[in-house]
């Protein structure tokens, strides 16, 4: 790494306070800087995976696998992937995956059962799932998937999301409630976002997680990760993870570092936020949220 790249890397690792973050976002060239960050971090993560694979014994795997650097948690048989992502000071807070199709429907519910999932966050438009829907939209209806029975107990429709309380029952008699959050405000063009509403949605999910955590502690159960899914499993889903981490870190320390957070996520999910517009959106959403907090403190 040359001196210029090293300096930029050091800048990316910095945690900044609210006023510095807001000042950066008001610069005329901030978008260009954000895009440069995105390109640099992707290059660094690609090098990280290449070197990681290179140090292993790949003789039996062949050169193609070394170049692709396929993550271990990719199930090539079903073409579905489940990737754990750490939260802020929370190990494996998220389990990111792609929205299930007919071939991966059973793997989806099987993983939800095995990982003790209590919260599902869906970031795909519901219209995209009509052919491969994995739960019933109407209260008291039941969706069946092999040994799993998923009953819809309650549906609550809000402006930008739908909360559905599900009951997951295994044929062995085990029963668990799952809160399903479907964010309906993600734009089709991937540009016309509603940052304030999306941040509010993330905070709502975290409040629900806190309630489930308290209940799990009382019953001596282990709280599973939040299962987050989108069309590909690593763009919208990892945007959600990145914003959640930055919000949590800012709430605890009053500091934030988007590039540092992004770099850590890329080490767990090689393909995370590969679309530059999604990375820009992370900054824009945090700008709206931190601005609102800053304004409220000065009034």
UniProtKB/Swiss-Prot annotation:
Coiled-coil zones: none
GO molecular function, one term: protein tyrosine phosphatase activity
Tyrosine-protein phosphatase domain boundaries: 16-289
Reaction equation(s) it catalyzes: O-phospho-L-tyrosyl-[protein] + H2O = L-tyrosyl-[protein] + phosphate
Enzyme Commission (EC) number: 3.1.3.48
PROSITE patterns, per database record: TYR_PHOSPHATASE_2 (PS50056), TYR_PHOSPHATASE_PTP (PS50055)
Stated family: Belongs to the protein-tyrosine phosphatase family.
Name of protein: Probable tyrosine phosphatase protein J4
Species this chain originates from: Microplitis demolitor bracovirus (isolate Webb)
